[in-house]
């Protein structure tokens, strides 16, 4: 399935039905009074979050959505049938913006939330409403209300507790596959991960969601590599796990490259709690591991953990630390 996280669509509510001009007809009654019914209300446009969805692909090819119009009123004071509302399902984490993207209209953060974005138009009044003492046979009625229409922007931000960051080939996808049941594509070349992946980590009868996004390279915020368009998917997380390839010639440069891209994208993202992990320690000697950890700790003034997603060295410790941070922020 294609991963689509940005779409622009047109939506319109249903118009109200027109009121009816009608007069009572009955045998032996020449001039019955007005009995025109009201028009039915138009259908509304409603968005609803659905945990079974994880992409906006349903809105990629069909972009125009209109609720049903209300029916016109009828004689014998019969009102027109109301139009059916249009319910559009979106993944949890979807945000609805104005067409220009500047105004946030709604943010879906839980399952089965509903948001009525456009109300259907009111039905018009039939001529029975306009009978007066001086006008016993009015031919006046009103038309149904024209419903609102608009273009909107849908943006999906995946909901996760932990975000994995690092350069391409830092081992993020392997980390995700080791600690969860997720099955991301893994190979020994850059940009194996082309779309975000989510997995659920189970720890001591508790769980949290972790997101792996495509690796960042220098200049990602300027569109280089796969760019920074996937960084929004870790904006909601509580903690970042920053994986660094231990086999790299300069782990400090690698670390700073990713930090620069995070800061260029968002101050909020740059200041999230971070767990720094020197990965692929299985291919290093103890002396090499300690040397690289010392360099990173001097450069960051933070604790650095040695792990190997190949042998599972230190991985469980990182998972438990992440869970502890998440619980402390609840």
Curated annotation (Swiss-Prot):
Its main location: cytoplasm. GTP binds at residues 166-173, 191-195, 212-215, 279-282, 308-310. GO terms for molecular function: GTP binding; GTPase activity; magnesium ion binding. Keywords: Cytoplasm, GTP-binding, Hydrolase, Magnesium, Metal-binding, Nucleotide-binding. One of its GO terms (cellular component) is cytoplasm. Its cofactor is Mg(2+). It is found in: Cytoplasm. It is an enzyme of class 3 (hydrolase). Pfam families: GTP1_OBG (PF01018), MMR_HSR1 (PF01926). Mg(2+) binds at residues 173, 193. Residues 1-159 form the Obg domain. Its EC number is 3.6.5.-. PROSITE patterns: G_OBG, GTP1_OBG, OBG. The keyword Transferase does not apply. Belongs to the TRAFAC class OBG-HflX-like GTPase superfamily. OBG GTPase family. An essential GTPase which binds GTP, GDP and possibly (p)ppGpp with moderate affinity, with high nucleotide exchange rates and a fairly low GTP hydrolysis rate. Plays a role in control of the cell cycle, stress response, ribosome biogenesis and in those bacteria that undergo differentiation, in morphogenesis control. This is GTPase Obg. The gene is obg.
